């Protein structure tokens, strides 16, 4: 397959053609997140709390997989743009070996720490028991999760977005179908409760791996995975981690943020912890859609950067920013229009619904301006400037928001914590523009 279309096709149609499959995939994936949480919420509010507390650890596992995949994607795209397909293949082969190593380490580590982690944020034995039961199954599928994301990034790097869309959508649909069947024991299926939710998720991750492997075999791509490249491509390991580690930290920071916010909010009420968990499920519908656009942008911007098309790189950034802003504006409108109805999908507790409605109206004030940070961070990753991207994520997830949340909680209680989100987005957007411009000028 000839990837030169990434520097020859007009930018807007190219970006739409690359991003649209990912946006559709992300929308389906977001729907899965919401549906999955909806079914877990039907078990009990304790089950929803357990899921919320396990989420940061799950997010960390995903962060390692996606972050390393972003580094892999950037390196492959760069070498394809430079016309060096062998180096791209070496990167892909090294990436697969390292992905499997990461999976083994994270499986063992997650299973060892999860109970102690849960006890840091809850004294309820019911919640802890539910969280451990869920975790013991979900983390056994870590190798499938990481293999899934590895192949996704490789196919994206060569512009095969429809393949990744197909894999993601089928996996999500399988998950959505299995959720009610094995959570509640419908028909011949056993009633597994919260373990059923974990099993459905795991099977949903295995499915696209099988699809990707079959497509890789029957419709070969220009990037080859070969055993001999393990030896030849050793010099690329450092480059993969140079981009991948900052990207991993970028994506892992929300885990730290959620855990820290859980600690701040738990002082006031367990309902605040539930609301935070629900918010992060809902916001995936908006942010994953914007991330779909950014994923479509990364291989294009990396390819053009490798090909020396710097004016085109700037245009790609600007159009991506506008597209992300439109998505965030739509998300803001929805959250302001029906905040309590959205929270009501996951809880019947009047206090949780009331607090959740307040949270959504306050947090959504920062959605639109966050498009600047999202686009800048993604563009920098695509350009191979992971360190600069990390600065933006540190501002959004640690440096600004945690002190703001802590101070605001002491000024006005748990409800004031939600203001920290939009304040952070405004400050981070300004920092993002400065960081991006300086990084690109170097």
Write out the residue ranges for each language-model feature:
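Small-residue-rich hydrophobic transmembrane alpha-helices
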Residues: 48-108, 145-164, 262, 275-339, ...
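Short alpha-helical transmembrane segments in multi-pass integral membrane proteins
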Residues: 1-19, 76-143, 189-245, 301-366, ...
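Residue-level signal for short hydrophobic patches within transmembrane helices
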Residues: 8, 12-31, 35, 57-64, ...
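Transmembrane helical elements of multi-pass membrane transporters/channels
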Residues: 17-36, 137, 171, 204-208, ...
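Structural signal for membrane-spanning alpha-helices in multi-pass inner-membrane proteins
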Residues: 110, 153, 179, 183, ...
């Amino acid at each position: 397959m000839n990837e030169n279309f990434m520097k020859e096709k007009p930018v807007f149609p190219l970006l739409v053609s690359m991003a649209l499959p990912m946006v559709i995939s992300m929308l389906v994936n977001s729907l899965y997140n919401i549906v999955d949480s909806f079914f877990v919420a039907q078990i009990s509010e304790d089950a929803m709390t357990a899921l919320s507390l396990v989420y940061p650890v799950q997010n960390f596992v995903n962060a390692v997989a996606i972050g390393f995949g972003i580094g892999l994607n950037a390196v492959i795209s760069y070498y394809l743009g430079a016309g060096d397909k062998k180096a791209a293949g070496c990167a892909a082969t090294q990436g697969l070996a390292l992905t499997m190593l990461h999976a083994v380490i994270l499986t063992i580590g997650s299973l060892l720490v999860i109970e102690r982690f849960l006890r840091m944020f809850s004294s309820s034995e019911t919640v802890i028991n539910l969280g451990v039961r869920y975790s013991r199954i979900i983390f056994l599928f870590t190798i499938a999760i990481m293999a899934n994301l590895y192949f996704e990034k490789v196919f994206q790097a060569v512009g095969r977005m429809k393949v990744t869309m197909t894999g993601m959508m089928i996996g999500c649909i399988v998950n959505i179908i299995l959720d009610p069947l094995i959570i509640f024991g419908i028909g011949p299926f056993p009633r597994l409760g919260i373990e059923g939710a974990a099993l459905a998720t795991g099977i949903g991750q295995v499915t696209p791996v099988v699809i990707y492997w079959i497509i890789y075999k029957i419709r070969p791509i220009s990037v080859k995975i070969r055993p001999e490249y393990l030896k030849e491509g050793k010099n690329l390991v450092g480059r993969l981690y140079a981009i991948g580690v900052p990207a991993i930290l970028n994506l892992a920071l929300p885990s730290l943020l959620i855990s820290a916010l859980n600690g701040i909010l738990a002082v006031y009420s367990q309902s605040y912890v539930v609301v935070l968990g629900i918010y992060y499920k809902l916001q995936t519908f908006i942010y994953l859609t914007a991330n779909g656009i950014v994923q479509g942008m990364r291989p294009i911007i990396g390819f053009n950067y490798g090909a020396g098309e710097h004016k085109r790189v700037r245009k790609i950034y600007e159009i991506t920013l506008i597209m992300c802003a439109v998505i965030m504006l739509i998300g803001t409108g929805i959250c302001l229009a029906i905040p309590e109805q959205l929270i009501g999908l996951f809880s019947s507790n009047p206090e949780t619904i009331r607090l959740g409605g307040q949270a959504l109206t306050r947090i959504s004030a920062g959605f639109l301006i966050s498009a600047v940070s999202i686009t800048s961070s993604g563009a920098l990753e695509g350009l191979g400037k992971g360190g600069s991207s990390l600065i933006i994520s540190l501002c959004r997830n640690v440096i600004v928001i945690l002190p703001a949340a802590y101070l605001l909680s002491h000024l006005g209680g748990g409800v004031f914590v939600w203001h920290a989100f939009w304040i952070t987005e405004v400050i981070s957007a300004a920092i993002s523009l400065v960081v991006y411009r300086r990084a690109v000028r170097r």
